[in-house]
Design a protein with these regions (language model features):
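Generic structural signal for small/hydrophobic residues in well-ordered secondary structure
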Residues: 20, 61, 77, 215, ...
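Serine-dependent acyl-ester chemistry module
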Residues: 82-260, 272-282
Length: 317
């Protein structure tokens, strides 16, 4: 975990925050991340652990919770949903699938050749000196140029790729693809009537129901915090869909669908769409990055704490 090691004495209430890079947030110093800000806002009366893993979807997070909940025995668990790609991640990961009767099944999956090559390259680069890696990263970032206008062509490419991912998934593929890429759930946001979109919603609901049941078995209260991404909540983001070209797009749809899923499975949910949308670009990283920044995580923590208190979660003494 990115947070400090759990206190073995466990003298305070312990909350664990699960999710992906919206939780791990290695683009910010740890003290500016959502879990760290949440703990600071309790005046350190609550120990808040950060169990987020960059690139994880809700399916992988469920498996991580199976390991960490019995080990660290928290008083509560928070699942942060990244409403950029968390619908699509389980389809690309191919670790879980629904059969024709809607029953969820697990299976083994292996990374595709591009992902394996990426990991091997990063493993090789990790042996270089810090200065050499910094120099390489600087040159890579210099080569990136933010488009002057939203890239609507890329959105069409995303939707085509999402249809292909869906077709491979339902045909039984066991190859995991795009493990660390932020692929916007454009099909759900723009075309909720598509089979790929409808399947993603059903799969997400089955996964969240499994997470709910796991937490109930462990005696751990669960709450979900849904965080929008820059394509939907930052008016200046480069990948923001054009309503003229995509009249079916609703910027609040991804977060609203997650909220509806939580309500149907009976999990308390906080939807941060309105909060972050009103704050605009100042709470997002900007450029080519869809993540919230330190200001966004602070605002999210300040909004989440009263919500969690309203669920009866103890803040200790």
């Amino acid at each position: 975990m990115r947070s400090p090691d759990p206190d073995p004495a466990h003298p305070r209430p312990r909350w664990i925050v699960f999710g992906d890079s919206f939780v791990m947030a290695d683009n910010e110093p740890y003290e500016r991340t959502f879990p760290a800000r949440l703990q600071a806002l309790t005046d350190d009366r609550v120990e808040v652990l950060s169990a987020g893993v960059t690139g994880y979807g809700p399916d992988q997070t469920w498996m991580r919770m199976q390991q960490l909940l019995p080990k660290w025995k928290p008083e509560a668990a928070i699942l942060v949903i990244c409403a950029v790609n968390d619908f699509g991640d389980p389809v690309r990961n191919n670790l879980m699938r629904l059969d024709a009767d809607g029953v969820l099944h697990r299976q083994q999956a292996t990374p595709g050749p591009q992902d394996r090559e990426w990991f091997l390259q990063r493993q090789e680069e990790s042996g270089r000196s810090g200065l050499a890696r910094l120099w390489l990263a600087w040159h890579q970032w210099r080569a990136l140029e933010v488009p002057k206008h939203p890239d609507q062509t890329l959105l069409a490419d995303y939707m085509r790729a999402e249809r292909e991912d869906y077709e491979a998934h339902i045909s039984g593929s066991t190859v995991a693809n795009a493990l660390l890429r932020d692929i916007y759930d454009a099909d759900v946001a723009i075309h909720p009537e598509w089979p790929s979109s409808q399947y993603k919603l059903r799969l997400a609901e089955a996964i969240l129901a499994g997470i709910r049941d796991l937490c109930a078995e462990q005696g751990v209260p669960l709450a979900v915090v849904v965080v929008p991404g820059a394509p939907d909540a930052d008016p200046d983001y480069w990948l923001r869909p054009d309503p003229g070209r995509y009249p079916g797009w609703q910027p609040e749809r991804l977060t609203s669908e997650w909220q509806g899923i939580c309500e149907r499975v009976g999990v308390p949910v906080l939807n941060l769409y309105g909060t972050l949308k009103d704050a605009g670009h100042r709470v997002f990283v900007g450029a080519l990055d869809p993540h919230w920044n330190g200001a966004g995580m602070d605002l999210g923590a300040r909004t989440a704490l009263p919500f969690l208190e309203s669920q009866g979660w103890s803040l200790g003494r």
